[in-house]
Amino acid sequence: MRFHHCIGDGTAMNTVMHRLMDTTPDAPIERPTPHSNHDHTLGPLLEPLVSTIEGTIKLADDLVHEGMEFLRHPEHLLNLPAQAASGALALSRVLLLPPEAKTPFKGQLGVQKCVAWSAPVPLDQVKQIGKVAGAKVNDVLLAAVAGALRAYLIGRDFKVDGLEIRAVIPVDLRPPSRAHDLGNEFGLVFLSLPLGTPSPVVRLAEVKQRMEALKRSPEAHVFYGLLNFFGRTPAQVEEQAVNLFGSKATAVMTNVRGPTEQLYLAGNRIRNIMFWVPQSGRLGMGISIMSYCGQVTLGVITDAGLVPDPQKITTAFEREFHVLYDVIVAKEHGNESAS
């Protein structure tokens, strides 16, 4: 299946896909509720008007809510200068980043794309690594991806000493109460991946530290506002902005938490779910991570002229993950047995 991003981001589309599937192989077929001819005739005519009215009511409600919040907590006004300064600092940090390092991942893009996906890795093992290392699931997976990209470059005889590349990572900004809403509601952060670090343990620690710093910064919210702003500007302005920020990174990386239970489609068991993140801003590589039913899969999409063999990256990811597990979890269990 192929969806346009205007329908929704990864979180929203995951919800849509989930609703199209069943949790049992023999789920009953739900028949659509019939509509009267009157509804059928007036629906398309009234829908734009109703949508406009609902949007106006929501905007008014938001404004009233914000006004009441300031009346209840006037001290929040004192925080506005600090918040503005923090946002400006986050934006200037990205704008002042030097152009991305020249690697085989960057270059002139063509039309043809290549895709690959890894064998699933157990989510429980990812969590075990994180528990021992004091890291999040996302930190563990990103560290394994960094190791895989490092291994790929070494395989192409590219010098990786001291090398770092940046990844643009979408961050879901929906509150839990609106987790099932359609639309795009994400910000962006720029993460530097330490490809020049040979030790997988040190690499994980560095990724963890950098992700924690990004979570404390307003960068994701700042870029959410920028995405909305540039989306309303002329196409030429929007394209220049996208290219500017695209020059600061090598890849788009996203992690979507999928369904935790076994799903079925038309009575057939779904063994795995995978997607490939769309690329923009002249970025030649997209890396997507999807969890489903206790397993995690890595997907890679690349420009065929730059990386014609993305399966080498997915294979390296599997290897790097097992190295992390053996070095961190197995070693920890060995130390416990010895004591």
Regions found by a protein language model. Give the residues of each.
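Soluble acyl-CoA-dependent acyltransferase catalytic core bearing the H(X)4D motif
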Residues: 1-283, 287-339
